Amino acid sequence: MGKRLWLWAPLALFAFFAGLAGYMLTQDKDEFVESEMIGQPLPDFALPAAFDGLPGASKADFAGSPKLLNIWASWCLPCIAEAPQLEALKAQGVEIIGIAIRDRPADVANFLGRYGNPYSRIGSDRISEVQLAIGSSGVPETFVIDAKGVIRYQHIGDIRESDVPKLLAELEKAQ
Amino acid sequence: MTAEIGLAALWLAAALAVLQMVSGAFALKAAPGEVNALAMHARPAAVVQAFLAVLAFAMLLYAFATTDLSLKLVASNSHSMKPLIYKLTGTWGNHEGSMLLWVGVLALSGGLLAGFEKRLPERTMGATLAVQGFVALGFYAFLLLASNPFERLPVPAPEGSGLNPLLQDIGLAIHPPTLYAGYVGLSVAFSLAMGALLTREVNPAFARVLRPWVLGAWVLLTLGITAGSYWAYYELGWGGWWFWDPVENASLMPWLAATALMHSVSVLAARDALRTWTIMLGVLAFSMSMLGTFLVRSGVLTSVHAFAVDPERGAFILGLLGLYIGGAFTIFALRAGAVAEGKRFAAVSREGALVFNNVMLSAILAIVLLGTLYPLLTEAFDVRVSVGPPYFNPASAIFAIPMLLVMAVGPLLRWRSDKPARLQFELALIAALVIGVIALVSFFGQFPLLPLLGLGLAAALAVAALLPLRGRSLKRVPVATWGMVIAHFGIAVALFGMACEGAFSKERLAAVVPGGTEQIGDFAVTLEGVTPVAGPNWTAIEARLAVRQNGGAPVILTPQARNFWSPPQSTSESALLTKWNGQLYAVIGQQAEDGRWQIRVWWKPFVTFIWYGGILVALGGLLSIAGRVSVDVRRRKATAQGDQRRADLDALGAAAPVPAE
């Protein structure tokens, strides 16, 4: 009998695994690794202007009220897709400070000319230095920064229409 | 049009899989020694199916080669500006294409088995083909219902959207297909094991049929893992050669099971022992292949290897896994008790050593499996953990160290029963080498424990691996024995590389101004300059490093930080300087505010031996296959000649002589 029971052991182990894996498949997967920087103050930075039309960006510019920090680039296709949503946020009275990654002034101006300019300031990050310092690995990404300069929320990827209320709520929470 | 031909071929192949399954099952209804009339369709069904599945894959290959942007798969994974070679490799660099490749290889090996294997009893063969058809059917269903590679777009896309740049590499051309072919070889082993279990024909003849498939799969897995390790080493730019990443583990686990299976099959073929154990490992090896596919494709685990994942497809694969593996283990539990026990043997014997090492391999497999699935388990309770080298290295070493020692001694033992006293010289030599090398190395400095043990074991194993050749005429040693000797020696070589990398690597991370020099080991590395460069679909900054060994002539290394567009992603291209005794590994990082560049350089002594060892191990496997097959062919020819002579003598009316054995 002992030997017979041993023969069932692989099946029992497998059933346990299958049950666990099945359960995990039904769980909503948190697709993004949250930045360690959530709850941390912004690192100190001062970036030069990305083109002639707007001033550059620095940490001090986030003082006063909650703002959005949008990391983007003129060469990034999803950034075109998210441009209307940024315009919508701006229309709701949200101040958006941009950081353009590895970009050229002429391209930035061209992009803003074609797809609209929702930004109050744009800093030029030619070597992704600030981008990496705030825990972002791609474009576009958007951060909610409160009045004290603390990172409160991170949105990875382009902002879809359905993401706008969530961002507004996070800005509200950051008051 | 070609896409429609491919799709039609797939549907037809699926229909033939049903025929193969049903017809094969009828073979079981035949009385022993007879053939059921309905069972005769299984073999042709498998052969035609192989042609159809290969045709479907060829059609997809054509669509990628010509960048047919009306296909959804091509539009979302390729790009007209990609070099042709990467267009072709892009065929299987995505979910649907890789599953089609899997199915194609599966059908091809089913066809080969059905077409050429005549040694098994028809009942076992029928049952095997039925199982093979059943397995294939599940994957056809998966392809056709949940991941159709031939789906057309309503409107052709103007341009494709690229390929993961990390995977845009010649390594990708070889690595996944090799692993897949290995996995599929294990599926044939699985079908054969189930066939033999259903007919209770688990015997040496069955083992001889099983062996080439297991060996072949094992060689391919060995090569696949070796190539994958080297790919991760130079492409990820982190300086490591094994990260215990879920995707890497997914390829390691079937290899461990296949290694155990291969040795177990040899015992069954030579000594008619370990019957149940062989069947069990046959099921286990394929389970691990499917589990690997599930883990990689479902996205339940996070990995550095970015695959497109989809929980629904994960559910489908999990369903297949439950059906095949759950079913197989159920049949195993019900049937294995009825398989007659094999021959017995003493604890100290060749079989004893093989069983011990099979248990050790299984234990390592359990360690890796647990470590890989543990994050899944804790995540069920909302705890995110990452299991890494601090767990895997010591936990697997606990079992790997005794295994390597027994591996040194095992091939020297006799079958059935042996006395340790007979091997006094060999045992003393092995012990002296282990202790001597460890003492010698410790004398020169403080090194971590595991690499130190690894060096001692590598030296002992390298010598012990050659001992089976001692006192024999090298010309008369069978090819298969050469295979074993070379494979075991290859393990020693790889172990030596791993231990050296662990013990003696030097690392230097420095911020350098252009023109500045850093010293690492014997090498002086000068940053001559940093320039932007552009490729077909990327731009990069490239550092020009002049490397001088002991003040000699400079060698130029050009590590790059690349930025791809479509999709935008940045990668780090390492630059390697290979010497006979190691590699210099250089990566360029960010530029600091003051204009200095981060340069990261490693000197890794003998690191290349890891992969040389892997290639030797695979070569040993190939020799073993060649040896076994040539013996089989000679035996078959001799039998045929004997039959011919007897027939001739019969025709002449003379009395047939008794054939000499």
List each model region and its residues.
Chain A
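N-terminal targeting signals for export/organelle localization
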Residues: M1-P48, Q175
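Short gly/ser/thr-rich secondary-structure transition/capping motifs
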Residues: Q27-D28, P48-P55, I122-D125
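Hydrophobic beta-strand anchors of alpha/beta hydrolase catalytic cores
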Residues: L68-L69, I96
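Thiol/disulfide oxidoreductase modules built on the thioredoxin-like
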Residues: G113-P118, D125-Q175
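Structural microenvironment flanking redox-active thiols in thiol-disulfide oxidoreductases
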Residues: I80-G116, R126-L132
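Aromatic-flanked redox-active Cys/Sec active sites in thiol-based oxidoreductases
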Residues: N70-W75
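A short beta-strand-turn-helix
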Residues: F45-K67
